[in-house]
């Protein structure tokens, strides 16, 4: 072959790279993720039923969905069309809205009610509530109801006592206290008496509107991306009616007394259909099915309308005191399960890629969604991948709204930042149970601090190189840089493999922790010559990954957490660090010169002022100033609240150290005092006070009989004699010391 012709080229063999696999509840195993339409992903997420404050159970789902969504979009590069619903028509909403309205009216009128009438009402409330307590079989809920009953009774006793004492001011206070303590039982009693009289639709609209706004505010505070499309049930009633009609036309639903029910057994008999795909073991679980029907839809007359106890409502005939919409079957409202089916199908059609929701919704809600949707389209599959987030417990205990054992999102945000909450979720599998506890949050807080210290160090160590000597960022590449680069590359491989494996963020963060630890060792061992470009590459990669995970908001490309300290949208403002740091740096340099001069002159008052600037003034401005050996220093912009917490923790640790020192000092003094007191005891009297052990003594004070009158054994007598002899020696020393004095 002529040398003037190019030689044959050997193509590299492609390496095996992991593919994204997701745990699919429809198969109960991890499956390769293959969208229906190339790189485009259609995704429907179950949204909230808006009748109360959002709590950490909601956060468990929506933060986890947001993490999954961001990673699929920003890491794996899928084009995601994300739809979420708002359930604003529901039995819970109807009942809560009615009860709130009636209670507010009653509370406003109660100030003018004669006391005997108020107390008469109280007796009726008590009887009804006692019936509720008696019917309840859940032990945890029974405890909660009993506590409510006790508080209500205590409030009544306090009110009647104030009346008997003629205390007018006390009566007004105790009356209000009773209303506060007995709010739920009173509202339940009022609903039973007057609920059917409520016919103003505004009552049923204002409650969900208010709580929907609060929900969106909570999601924004948690740095959760808004959906691309938001569907409200109240705006989809015509589409829901049409969807139900399709199921009837396909012979799998039937009307009864102005309601419409899904024919579960008829559906399951069809060859292409399968009821309860997610939880087949639950087929026939009428208790769960009834819970899914709603509080206002399980009366005996409603249940008797069904052909089978397995059937569930697609359309509910509205009774007096319930909102209604027109339909071919009469005035009513949609059933809970049909709402999501109709809305998702209106946006996506007969099939879509991903459906997400909490694990507690698997049966009956999601199984019913699947059944009625497949019945409407006469297809065997409506959703390809069903992803369910795990339960959330509160310090190891089951969280339950009915038990009033829940932490609202706003309450959680008062204790921890949105970043810390998200890190807590990232450090756990999205599909497993997460325990929201002090230990969990401490783990997240420490991880955040660990990363933040690394980011601050990298920025401080490389800042001067970039601004003053940019050539030094390309320092010679030695074995230590090669080793860190190798660790960096292997960590990227580990992170990718973890994210491909069912979006395992916990393992990804473990790999990041190891990479940061290796980088910290590199910094420690190579202070005289650091490759700033390599360090910044590592820090930028980790920061970018945290952006992808939603733990950092704002534009990508920087290093570290935003100076505001949060993951929320406030962090997305201008580059505060670039703007402020030059001024802070100048102040720090001036302080350093003053400090060095003060040391030379032994001007301790000036040194104290320099320390005060470092320890008290700058932290209040979000600036951490660190004095280092050799007259050097480091300036770091940190979230002000974090710095103040650090300072408080440092002061608390110092106070505890001082207290421990004082405790030890007092213990030594007490031991010395006890020893001195022991020396003063006459050996003949040392056992006489131990009457709980002995009942008789000889002329030398030695015990002869135990407390039961039995003679002391010879072996025991010898031990007591030895103790007495030792005391005799101490006593002689004491007497001698007195004579010398």
UniProtKB/Swiss-Prot annotation:
Documented EC number(s): 6.1.1.16
Chief location bin: cytoplasm
Localization, UniProt: Cytoplasm
GO cellular component, one term: cytoplasm
Keyword list, A-Z: Aminoacyl-tRNA synthetase, ATP-binding, Cytoplasm, Ligase, Metal-binding, Nucleotide-binding, Phosphoprotein, Protein biosynthesis, Zinc
Motif ('HIGH' region): 48-58
SUPFAM superfamilies per UniProt: Anticodon-binding domain of a subclass of class I aminoacyl-tRNA synthetases (SSF47323), Nucleotidylyl transferase (SSF52374)
Catalytic activity, reaction form: tRNA(Cys) + L-cysteine + ATP = L-cysteinyl-tRNA(Cys) + AMP + diphosphate
Cofactor: Zn(2+)
Keyword Phosphoprotein found: yes
InterPro entries xrefs: Cys-tRNA-ligase, Cys-tRNA/MSH_ligase, Rossmann-like_a/b/a_fold, tRNA-synt_1_cat_dom, tRNAsynth_Ia_anticodon-bd
Cystines in this chain: none
Entry keyword Amino-acid biosynthesis: no
GO biological process terms held by the UniProt record: cysteinyl-tRNA aminoacylation
Highest taxon of the lineage: Eukaryota
Enzyme class: ligase
Post-translational modification Phosphoserine, affected residues: 297
Residues bound to ATP: 401
Cofactor note: Binds 1 zinc ion per subunit.
Gene3D superfamilies: Cysteine-tRNA ligase, C-terminal anti-codon recognition domain, HUPs
MF terms in GO: ATP binding; cysteine-tRNA ligase activity; metal ion binding; tRNA binding
Binding site for Zn(2+): 46, 340, 365, 369
Position of sequence motif 'KMSKS' region: 398-402
Family indicated by similarity: Belongs to the class-I aminoacyl-tRNA synthetase family.
Protein name stated in the entry: Cysteine--tRNA ligase, cytoplasmic
Natural source organism: Drosophila pseudoobscura pseudoobscura (Fruit fly)
Gene this chain is encoded by: Aats-cys
């Amino acid at each position: 072959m002529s040398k003037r012709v190019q030689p044959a080229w050997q193509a590299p063999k492609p390496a095996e790279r992991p593919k994204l696999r997701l745990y699919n509840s429809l198969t109960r195993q991890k499956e390769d993720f293959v969208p229906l339409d190339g790189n485009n992903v259609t995704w429907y997420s179950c949204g909230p039923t808006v009748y109360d404050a959002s709590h950490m159970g909601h956060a468990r789902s929506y933060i986890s969905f947001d993490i999954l969504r961001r990673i699929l979009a920003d890491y794996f590069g899928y084009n995601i069309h994300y739809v979420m619903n708002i359930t604003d028509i529901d039995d819970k909403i109807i009942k809560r809205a009615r009860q709130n309205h009636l209670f507010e009216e009653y509370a406003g009128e109660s100030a003018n009610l004669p006391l005997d009438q108020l107390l008469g009402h109280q007796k009726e409330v008590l009887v009804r509530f006692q019936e509720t307590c008696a019917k309840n079989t859940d032990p945890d809920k029974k405890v909660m109801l009993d506590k409510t009953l006790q508080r209500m009774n205590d409030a009544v006793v306090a009110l009647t006592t104030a009346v008997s004492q003629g205390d007018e001011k006390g009566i007004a206070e105790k009356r209000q206290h009773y209303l506060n303590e007995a709010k739920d039982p009173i509202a339940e009693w009022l609903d039973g008496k007057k609920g059917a009289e409520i016919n103003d639709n505004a009552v049923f609209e204002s409650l969900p509107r208010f709580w929907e706004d609060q929900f969106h505010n909570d999601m924004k505070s948690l740095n959760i991306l808004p959906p691309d499309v938001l569907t409200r049930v109240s705006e989809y009633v015509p589409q829901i009616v049409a969807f139900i009609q399709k199921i009837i036309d396909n012979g799998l639903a039937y009307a009864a007394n102005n309601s419409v029910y899904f024919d579960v057994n008829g559906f399951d008999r069809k060859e292409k259909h399968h009821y309860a795909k997610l939880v087949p073991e639950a087929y026939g679980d009428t208790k769960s099915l009834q819970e899914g029907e709603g509080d206002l839809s399980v009366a005996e007359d409603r249940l008797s309308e069904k052909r089978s106890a397995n059937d569930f409502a697609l359309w509910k005939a509205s009774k007096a005191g319930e909102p209604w919409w027109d339909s071919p079957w009469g005035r009513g409202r949609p059933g809970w399960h049909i709402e999501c089916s109709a809305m998702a199908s209106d946006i996506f059609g007969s099939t879509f890629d991903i459906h997400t929701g909490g694990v507690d919704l698997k049966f009956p809600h999601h199984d019913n969604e699947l059944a009625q949707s497949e019945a409407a389209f006469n297809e065997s599959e409506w959703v390809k991948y069903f992803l369910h987030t795990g339960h959330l417990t509160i310090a190891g205990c089951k969280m339950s709204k009915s038990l009033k054992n829940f932490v609202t999102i706003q309450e959680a945000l008062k204790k921890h930042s949105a970043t810390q909450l998200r890190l807590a979720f990232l450090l756990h599998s999205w599909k497993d149970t997460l325990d929201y506890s002090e230990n969990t949050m401490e783990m997240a807080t420490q991880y955040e601090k660990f990363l933040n210290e690394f980011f601050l160090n990298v920025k401080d160590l490389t800042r001067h190189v970039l601004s003053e000597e940019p050539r030094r960022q390309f320092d010679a590449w030695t074995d230590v840089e090669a080793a860190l680069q190798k660790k960096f590359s292997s960590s990227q491989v580990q992170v990718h493999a973890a994210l491909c494996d069912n979006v395992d963020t916990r393992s990804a963060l473990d790999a990041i922790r190891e990479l940061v630890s290796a980088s910290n060792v590199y910094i420690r061992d190579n202070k005289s010559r650091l490759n700033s470009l390599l360090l910044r590459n590592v820090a930028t990669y980790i920061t970018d990954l945290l952006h992808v995970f939603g733990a950092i908001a704002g534009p990508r490309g920087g290093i570290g957490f935003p100076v505001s300290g949060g993951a929320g949208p406030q962090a997305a403002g201008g580059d505060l660090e670039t703007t402020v740091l030059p001024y802070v740096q100048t102040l720090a340099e001036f302080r350093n010169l003053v400090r060095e001069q003060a040391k030379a002159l032994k001007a301790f008052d000036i040194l104290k002022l320099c320390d005060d600037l470092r320890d008290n003034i700058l932290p209040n401005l979000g600036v951490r100033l660190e004095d280092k050996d050799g007259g050097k220093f480091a300036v770091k912009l940190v979230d002000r609240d974090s710095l103040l917490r650090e300072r408080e923790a440092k002061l608390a640790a110092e106070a505890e150290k001082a207290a421990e020192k004082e405790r030890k000092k007092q213990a030594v003094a007490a031991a010395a005092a006890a020893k001195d007191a022991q020396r003063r005891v006459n050996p003949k009297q040392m056992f006489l006070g131990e009457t709980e052990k002995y009942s008789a003594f000889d002329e030398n004070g030695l015990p002869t009989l135990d407390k039961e009158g039995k003679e002391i054994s010879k072996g025991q007598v010898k031990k007591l004699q030895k103790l007495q002899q030792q005391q005799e020696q101490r006593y002689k020393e004491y007497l001698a010391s007195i004579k010398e004095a």
